[in-house]
């Protein structure tokens, strides 16, 4: 749908240019409206899909590093391809998002740190590089990541952006609040966070919610439990008679 929208925008610009120069009497795309289908956007990777990718691409490969960067930083492809060792200090990754301009400080997950350490450094500026040691552009990286997914036997719906959504899902399942998730993803809108975390495991989250409710109720009952030494017990009178 985004591709159709870009094509329509480009055509309208071209036809307006023609109209201004009297090459056209009317703008042919006038009145055209794209019907946007209801969608949650990119597919959120499942744990089985993540496991399949990991089973095919071993630690130490660029493919495995790309997966880890997507899962443990929750950043977009355009930001991930720019990440280098110079952006990591004292276990914290500094990211300035290309799309929003937001500056983020992201603690490095131990698993990501181990994978970075196990991956041979080819380039000097970025962690992800081509075989020749050059940094990826966002588009070329997307093509390469899709090839890695194909090699792992994953469906075409598994794209890199889906790892960002999987990261948000994992955070939600871990009990993180919307504000905590946004602190990592860089989202300014909590509504967008809600859309990202719709794939969270509803059943396990519901069990945790009910357990919290039960624990709170139990705590409240214990706080109002009567003290036998302070409250008169009518049975004592019967016993003493």
PLM regions with names:
Residues 1-18, 32, 108, 141:
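Non-catalytic DNA-binding core/recognition domains of DNA-processing enzymes
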Residues 2, 78, 179-182:
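Residues within the helices of the helix-turn-helix
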Residues 5-9, 20, 24-26, 30-77, ...:
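Basic, Lys/Arg- and aromatic-enriched nucleic-acid-binding interface segment
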Residues 26, 37, 92-96, 111-144, ...:
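Major-groove DNA-contacting interfaces characterized by cationic-aromatic clusters
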Residues 44, 97-101, 178, 185-210:
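Catalytic-site neighborhood detector that most strongly recognizes the C-terminal catalytic loop/helix
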Residues 55-63, 73, 102, 106, ...:
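Short, basic (Lys/Arg/His-rich) helix/loop patches that form interaction surfaces
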Residues 86-92, 155, 176-197, 224-226, ...:
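Short, polar N-cap/turn motifs at the start of nucleic acid-interacting alpha helices
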Residues 130-133, 191, 210-241:
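C-terminal secondary-structure termini that scaffold catalytic or DNA-interacting sites
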């Amino acid at each position: 749908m985004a591709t159709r929208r870009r094509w329509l925008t480009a055509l309208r610009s071209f036809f307006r240019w023609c109209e201004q120069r009297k090459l056209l009497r009317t703008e042919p795309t006038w009145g055209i409206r794209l019907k946007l289908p209801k969608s949650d956007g990119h597919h959120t990777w499942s744990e089985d899909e993540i496991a399949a990718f990991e089973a095919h691409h071993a630690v130490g490969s660029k493919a495995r590093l790309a997966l880890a960067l997507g899962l443990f930083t929750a950043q977009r492809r355009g930001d991930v391809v720019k990440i280098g060792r110079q952006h990591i200090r004292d276990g914290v990754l500094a990211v300035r998002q290309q799309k929003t301009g937001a500056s983020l400080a992201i603690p490095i997950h131990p698993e990501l740190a181990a994978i970075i350490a196990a991956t041979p450094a080819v380039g000097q500026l970025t962690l992800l590089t081509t075989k020749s040691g050059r940094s990826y552009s966002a588009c070329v990286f997307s093509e390469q990541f899709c090839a890695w997914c194909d090699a792992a036997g994953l469906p075409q719906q598994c794209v890199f952006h889906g790892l960002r959504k999987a990261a948000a899902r994992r955070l939600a399942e871990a009990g993180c609040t919307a504000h905590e998730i946004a602190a990592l993803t860089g989202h300014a809108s909590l509504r967008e966070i809600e859309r990202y975390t719709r794939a969270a495991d509803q059943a396990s989250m519901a069990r945790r919610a009910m357990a919290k409710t039960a624990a709170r109720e139990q705590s409240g009952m214990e706080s109002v439990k009567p003290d036998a030494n302070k409250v008169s017990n009518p049975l004592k009178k019967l016993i003493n008679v």
